[in-house]
């Protein structure tokens, strides 16, 4: 299905506005006196906001344009997800190590956010209910990552078509650059309220993820630079605003988590653009949100990951 450059640019703007500016609307609503702050309704609304800020607009636009799965790069062979298991491994290891570092609970570390939710269930939120909602949140974050990053990459390729560059070169340059930036920014922040161990684990995990993705991306494939840069810029801006903005928020935190998100978004976007190996991002997205880590491209994970 052909999408004109003008339509693609409008789609990029709408999807970016939904995730960046939509966050302001959600923040305003959650501060209203009648908004539920506790209980099942509050948790379910949290799941709804995740989908509204990430997946709803891309899904509606893909349906309107008529390209559906192709709008996310997922119209290729689905068996490619098996190759993505190797990408999920370093992310899973990062999640397990950080969970052990935070809680010291060895028994339920493999249960990820589900185990954490059950352990932290309060008197007002029964463990079973909390666990179910945690599962819904995990599913929403996974779908949101696949929809938002894949959609921005595909539409960015169609919206801006300057001279094509090597896809592997973009993965190496942007991905490893993001890992290096995250390491430096995180260590600088650890001089204040941050801690150096999670910074090192996250940065090394991202670097390993980029190196593995570099082996998975087909050599000799050229794409417009904007196809990768578009989702990277959007997720970084979203992280800056989620942390409070340039002047009133925690800018060091925003830049650190934004760098990690940029590296992960680079990997997801690159694989989505290959089409034949795009489904490899599915295991990666699952691992990114089964264990809440700062590697998620979604700023909505900042609180859960304790970045």
Report each predicted region and the residues it spans.
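Short, Lys/Arg-rich, polar N-terminal cytosolic tail immediately upstream
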Residues: 1-8
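Membrane-interfacial loop-to-transmembrane alpha-helix junctions, especially the N-terminal start
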Residues: 9-17, 165-174, 222-230, 277-280
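Alpha-helical transmembrane segments in multi-pass membrane proteins
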Residues: 14-66, 113-125
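Aromatic-anchored segments of alpha-helical transmembrane domains
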Residues: 20-29, 92-97, 175-189, 230-245, ...
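Juxtamembrane helix-loop-helix connectors linking adjacent transmembrane helices
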Residues: 34-45, 68-226, 245-253, 257, ...
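A structural signal for well-ordered alpha-helical segments within the folded catalytic domains
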Residues: 51, 150, 265-266
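Transmembrane alpha-helix boundary and packing residues in multipass membrane permease domains
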Residues: 58-59, 150, 154, 269
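Functionally important transmembrane alpha-helices
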Residues: 203-219, 223-307
């Amino acid at each position: 299905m052909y999408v004109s450059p003008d339509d693609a640019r409008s789609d990029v703007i709408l999807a970016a506005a939904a995730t960046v500016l939509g966050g302001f609307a959600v923040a305003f609503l959650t501060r209203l006196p009648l908004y539920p702050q506790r209980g099942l309704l509050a948790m379910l609304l949290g799941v709804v906001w995740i989908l509204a800020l990430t997946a709803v607009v891309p899904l509606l636009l893909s349906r309107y344009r008529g390209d559906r799965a192709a709008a996310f790069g997922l119209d290729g062979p689905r068996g490619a997800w098996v190759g993505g298991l190797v990408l999920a491994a370093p992310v899973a290891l990062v999640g397990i190590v950080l969970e052990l570092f935070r809680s010291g609970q060895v028994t339920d570390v493999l249960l990820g956010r589900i185990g954490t939710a059950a352990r932290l269930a309060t008197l007002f939120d029964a463990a079973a209910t909390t666990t179910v909602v945690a599962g819904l949140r995990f599913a929403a974050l996974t779908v949101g990552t696949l929809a938002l990053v894949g959609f921005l990459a595909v539409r960015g390729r169609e919206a801006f078509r300057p001279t094509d560059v090597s896809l592997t070169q973009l993965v190496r340059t942007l991905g490893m650059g993001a890992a290096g930036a995250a390491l430096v920014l995180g260590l600088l922040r650890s001089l204040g309220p941050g801690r150096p161990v999670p910074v090192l684990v996250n940065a090394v995990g991202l670097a390993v993820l980029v190196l593995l993705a570099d082996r998975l991306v087909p050599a000799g494939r050229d794409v417009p630079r904007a196809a990768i840069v578009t989702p990277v810029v959007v997720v970084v801006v979203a992280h800056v605003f989620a942390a409070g903005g340039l002047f009133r928020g925690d800018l060091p935190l925003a830049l650190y988590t934004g760098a990690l998100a940029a590296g992960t978004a680079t990997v997801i976007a690159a694989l989505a653009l290959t089409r034949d190996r795009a489904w490899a991002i599915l295991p990666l997205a699952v691992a990114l949100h089964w264990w809440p880590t700062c590697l998620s491209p979604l700023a909505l994970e900042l609180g859960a990951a304790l970045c």
